[in-house]
Amino acid sequence: MKLAIVILNWNGVEMLKTYLPSVVDYSREDNVQIYVADNASVDNSVKWVRSSYPLVRLILLTENYGFAGGYNRALKEISSDYYLLLNSDVRVTPHWLRPLIGYMDKHSEVAACQPKLLSMKDTSSFEYAGACGGFIDHLGYPFCRGRIFNTVELDKGQYNTPLHVFWATGAALMVRSVDYWNAGGLDDRF
């Protein structure tokens, strides 16, 4: 498989009802599989996914391992060239995967990438969490493209060109599976 889109869930049936449809509708590519990794939810998330989206594969974890622990355990169950860790509250748009897959296929030296994230409240502005990748300034202070402190920029196309960043957001993180595991996965403490 080329790409596994993995959505970590814990008691998030309402988020899945709201956002999973766009992921399913706009991720119809060859060699792409969508997974919901469930962190031992007690709501009816699993039942809803099974009945509403039978082609979405479920990975059922035995307890709530949190973000990093949940992804690490779920990804061990998946064989794929790339993983795309996607928050359950992300709405994707048509053709969102093609630039990510194309870039990673052309740049074997790149371990991970992310799409541009726009705000759900105002799609002309960047999302506060992650926006367009992160940096560390010369004083060691972290900041994101698209946001400085509490000021979020309007999207005027200024970040449409790929750029090497210090980190990519976990809200929509595409990573080469071999590099994910060579790095030891995510730190389970987070």
What residues fall within each predicted segment?
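Glycine-rich, basic loop-to-helix element that forms the pyrophosphate-binding segment
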Residues: L60-I78, S88
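Conserved donor NDP-sugar-binding/catalytic core segment of glycosyltransferases
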Residues: R91-Y141
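Short aromatic/hydrophobic "clamp" motif used to bind/position activated sugar donors
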Residues: Y83
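A recurrent flexible, glycine/aromatic-enriched loop bordering the glycosyltransferase active site
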Residues: H138-C144, F149-V178, N182, R189-F190
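A conserved acidic beta->alpha catalytic loop
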Residues: V13, S22, D38-K47, E63
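Short, acidic, metal-binding catalytic loop of nucleotide-sugar glycosyltransferases
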Residues: P21-N31
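Short beta-strand/loop segment that forms part of the nucleotide-sugar
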Residues: N31-A40, I59-L61
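Cell-envelope/extracellular polymer assembly enzymes that use nucleotide-activated donors
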Residues: K2-A4, Q33
